[in-house]
């Protein structure tokens, strides 16, 4: 739901916290994106990290989707944590009437269209992360940091 700021119409955008500069990625780093940060000048940005919101620590073992489960490189099934984080992100998106989301590409949580194949070898396959799947089911448009030219602004 667009909001007003003076004469400007502002979009409400859910954004992966790592893209905003938060050190929440699995290895404890970020992937700050200045172009996304600039969107905060004229839009409402709501940061999320589904992995942390689901109860996972930072740093943490990398995880990949294997069949319908999310498995860490140590062999631990972390599907429940990923689902809990996705549901929390969805709650925030719906509560704030988000117009769309910008989520981290290739992540098992936030990846859209392309994710790692579950072998922990760096190979990628077509697919969506857990949060993206849930957002799509609830008709929340999702973009990655590689699709900023497609944003409906």
Where are these regions (language model features)?
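Extreme N-terminal starter segment of soluble prokaryotic enzymes
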Residues: 9-14
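Short N-terminal binding/cap micro-motifs at the start of the first secondary-structure element
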Residues: 21-28
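Hydrophobic/aromatic beta-strand patches that form the interior of the parallel beta-sheet core
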Residues: 46-48, 102, 143
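Short, surface-exposed acidic-centric catalytic microdomains
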Residues: 31-72
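Short, well-ordered beta-to-alpha junction loops that form the rim of enzyme active sites
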Residues: 18, 104-107, 147
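Divalent-metal-activated hydrolytic enzyme cores
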Residues: 4-8, 23, 53, 63-88, ...
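Internal, conserved structured core segments that host functional sites
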Residues: 104-115, 119
């Amino acid at each position: 739901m667009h909001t007003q700021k003076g004469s400007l119409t502002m979009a409400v955008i859910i954004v992966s916290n790592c893209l905003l500069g938060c050190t929440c990625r699995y290895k404890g780093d970020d992937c700050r994106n200045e172009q996304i940060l600039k969107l905060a000048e004229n839009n409402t940005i709501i940061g999320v990290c589904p992995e942390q919101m689901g109860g996972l620590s930072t740093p943490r073992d990398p995880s990949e989707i294997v069949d319908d489960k999310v498995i860490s490189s140590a062999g631990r099934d972390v599907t429940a944590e990923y689902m809990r984080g996705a549901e929390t992100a969805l709650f925030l998106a719906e509560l704030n009437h988000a117009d769309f989301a910008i989520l981290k590409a290739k992540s098992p949580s936030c990846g859209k269209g392309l994710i790692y194949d579950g072998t922990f070898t760096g190979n990628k396959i077509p697919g969506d992360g857990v949060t993206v799947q849930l957002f799509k089911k609830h008709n929340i448009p999702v973009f990655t940091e590689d699709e900023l030219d497609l944003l409906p602004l």
